[in-house]
């Protein structure tokens, strides 16, 4: 006969309890996964989401701890922190709303993808940014500034429009107009330079866009061929507003050193205060590049190029008209107080003899036929995008939200840094 000691009985009891706990944990995990799948199916069903009982279930708040209920309540978030989705038929946008089809661009913090909205069947360019990468470089202010600028310029024909923005715990999503005529940079690389009428047309549309931004007290600061797109008809569309500076009035200045080396104005290199005329310098640099094939003071050696911008006189070859020479000399004036646009901003550019052939009212209404048609056959025509992007596989993580149970502390911290990012347009913007 086997006699069980007290220790043996305790070990047996502990083993049974541990086994029961393991079974219970496995059961709870399975139920939780099943419940999560069930809720996801409901959330993805637009008809179910409209049912009052379903809405009340999805809005249940977690119970508060008794000791917390009597604690001093936290102050309400400031207006800039509140998530304002607005009255919209799609107030809870999420990655699974889209089919992400192709990578069409890349940047420091993420990718731009061609996406088709599943319900609307509409095509968009979705800019997907990694929050942790943004925070690591302390660029969250620039990202929120880009969002704010996009909200302001949705009505202008030569500025890319933001349809809505949303976020997951680890990513930000800008849902933008899909523009597939190619970057101006791409077309310049292929053709080396443009004839003067074509360069004038593009410069006029760019100037119109910059003038509109200035009317909103926004300085663009990063004009370059890579940020200038052509739409399917051949009109200019300005994109990428990450370096925009808001609240710069007519005589206001700022001093942040930023931009792209080839297009930096002398006052920026000198680290002096600068104003809206920095954009007119950049317009001059882009116009020069369209006419001659390279930026005006270009050198492969960045230090030499900076010295050229600061000290080298502007050299113009004789193969352009006198009005083109005059406008380039005015825009690329090293002294910003004497630069074309210093007194009356866009009106000076608009009234310059170089643009005398432009009917500005027809231009803004897109009644002028562009000098070049990209001839795209439809949204799936990607011929004007760099194959380096379009041949890259679409990451699986782009189209799904991370499991909240698996979020790390750093991801949660990143999630909290972009309160107020999400945006949906008011209903009247769809009318």
Curated annotation (Swiss-Prot):
Transmembrane segments: none
Residue interval(s) of motif Nuclear localization signal: 131-141
GO molecular function: ATP binding; protein serine kinase activity; protein serine/threonine kinase activity
EC number: 2.7.11.1
GO biological process, alphabetically ordered: apoptotic process
Region (Disordered): 64-92
Occurrences of domain Protein kinase (ranges): 98-355
Subunit structure: Homodimer; disulfide-linked. Forms a trimeric complex with FBXW7 and NOTCH1. Interacts with MAPK3/ERK1, MAPK1/ERK2, MAP2K1/MEK1, MAP2K2/MEK2, NEDD4, NEDD4L, MAPT/TAU, MAPK7, CREB1, SLC9A3R2/NHERF2 and KCNJ1/ROMK1. Associates with the mammalian target of rapamycin complex 2 (mTORC2) via an interaction with MAPKAP1/SIN1.
Name used for this protein in its record: Serine/threonine-protein kinase Sgk1
Biological source species: Bos taurus (Bovine)
């Amino acid at each position: 006969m086997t006699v069980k000691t007290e220790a043996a009985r305790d070990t047996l009891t502990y083993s049974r309890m541990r086994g029961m706990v393991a079974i219970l944990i496995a059961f709870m995990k399975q139920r939780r996964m099943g419940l999560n799948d069930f809720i996801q199916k409901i959330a993805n069903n637009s008809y179910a989401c409209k049912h009052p009982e379903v809405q009340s279930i999805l809005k249940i708040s977690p119970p508060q701890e008794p000791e917390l209920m009597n604690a001093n309540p936290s102050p309400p978030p400031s207006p800039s922190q509140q998530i304002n989705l607005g009255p919209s038929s799609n107030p809870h946008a999420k990655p699974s709303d889209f089919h992400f089809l192709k990578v069409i661009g890349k940047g420091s913090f993420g990718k731009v993808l061609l996406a088709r909205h599943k319900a609307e069947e509409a095509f968009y360019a979705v800019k997907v940014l990694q929050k942790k990468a943004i925070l690591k470089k302390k660029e969250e202010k620039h990202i929120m500034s880009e969002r704010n600028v996009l909200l302001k310029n949705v009505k202008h024909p030569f500025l890319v429009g933001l349809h809505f923005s949303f976020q997951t715990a680890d990513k930000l999503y800008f849902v933008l107009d899909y523009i597939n005529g190619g970057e101006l940079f791409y077309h310049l690389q292929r053709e080396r330079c443009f004839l003067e009428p074509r360069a004038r047309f593009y410069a006029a549309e760019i100037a119109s866009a910059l003038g509109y931004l200035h009317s909103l007290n926004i300085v663009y600061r990063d004009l370059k061929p890579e940020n200038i797109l052509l739409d399917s008809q051949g009109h200019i569309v300005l994109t990428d507003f990450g370096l925009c500076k808001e609240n710069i009035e007519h005589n206001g200045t700022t001093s942040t050193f930023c931009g792209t080396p080839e297009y930096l104005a002398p006052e920026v290199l000198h680290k002096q205060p600068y104003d809206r005329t920095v954009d007119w310098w950049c317009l001059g640099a882009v116009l020069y590049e369209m006419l001659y094939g390279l930026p005006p003071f270009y050198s492969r050696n960045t230090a030499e190029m900076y010295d050229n911008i600061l000290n080298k006189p502007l050299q113009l070859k004789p193969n352009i008209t006198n009005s083109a020479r005059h406008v380039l000399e005015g825009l690329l004036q090293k002294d910003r107080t004497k630069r074309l646009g210093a007194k009356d901003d866009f009106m000076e550019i608009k009234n310059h003899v170089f643009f005398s052939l432009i009917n500005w009212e027809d231009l803004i209404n897109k009644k002028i036929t562009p000098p070049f048609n990209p001839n795209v056959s439809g949204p799936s025509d990607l011929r004007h995008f760099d194959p380096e992007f379009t041949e890259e596989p679409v990451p699986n993580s782009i189209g799904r939200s991370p499991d909240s149970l698996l979020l790390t502390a750093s991801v949660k911290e990143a999630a909290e840094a972009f309160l107020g990012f999400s945006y949906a347009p008011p209903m009247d913007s769809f009318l």
